[in-house]
């Protein structure tokens, strides 16, 4: 499938409320990724907008997680990987040698599929990033920890046990702690790779509610296998298949009136 075949929504298909001009946060132009001889991503062209939740859906092995790892250059940690094309974060080429990867990963946070708190106290988990960036004042750290835990909807549950080991939290609490840890360095974008797949339904609902609150300040890009989740929480959705973007558009329209038969078949559960 050629790049030009990716389905684009016509303006008349999108409600006027969705046509408000928004700042582009990320642009991907002609991105190709290979693992050795395996062509994992093929000619990806996508743009993401500020203060929106964008969902990336598709069957296992379609390239979703590979793609999200390119956005903060974690892909470079994988042996024998090769990239071609361009990714711009707020107009700046992220693979440019003048752009320190540490700076990019401060601006673009990442929350993984499995909660991965450090084997430290709840407080030290959240304070870790600010300390790395040179903040030592205890009062300032206290403020950051409380603010981040409040933003992650966790403060009331842990405020009396901040110095207990974070590994003693439930799975859902650990994932919200990881979100708080991400927020503590004040990122611009939050990447989430299957953030609720290991959680129970109640914890999943809390994280989804949290994402809705966070998008008033942050841009969120989430990879999910859960189509119902994508439909519930996202503003836009990209459907990946075999390393290609098949369709990308406003979520309500993509789910109710998909323009490509492969999208319709996937949403209907005919494969995947």
Curated annotation (Swiss-Prot):
It is a peripheral membrane protein. CDD domains: ABC_PstB_phosphate_transporter. InterPro entries: AAA+_ATPase, ABC_transporter-like_ATP-bd, ABC_transporter-like_CS, P-loop_NTPase, PstB-like. One of its GO terms (molecular function) is ATPase-coupled phosphate ion transmembrane transporter activity. Residues 20-267 form the ABC transporter domain. Pfam families: ABC_tran. PROSITE patterns: ABC_TRANSPORTER_1, ABC_TRANSPORTER_2, PSTB. One of its GO terms (biological process) is phosphate ion transmembrane transport. Its EC number is 7.3.2.1. Its main location: membrane. It catalyses: phosphate(out) + ATP + H2O = ADP + 2 phosphate(in) + H(+). GO terms for cellular component: plasma membrane. It is found in: Cell membrane. Part of the ABC transporter complex PstSACB involved in phosphate import. Responsible for energy coupling to the transport system. The complex is composed of two ATP-binding proteins (PstB), two transmembrane proteins (PstC and PstA) and a solute-binding protein (PstS). This is Phosphate import ATP-binding protein PstB. It comes from Geobacillus kaustophilus (strain HTA426).
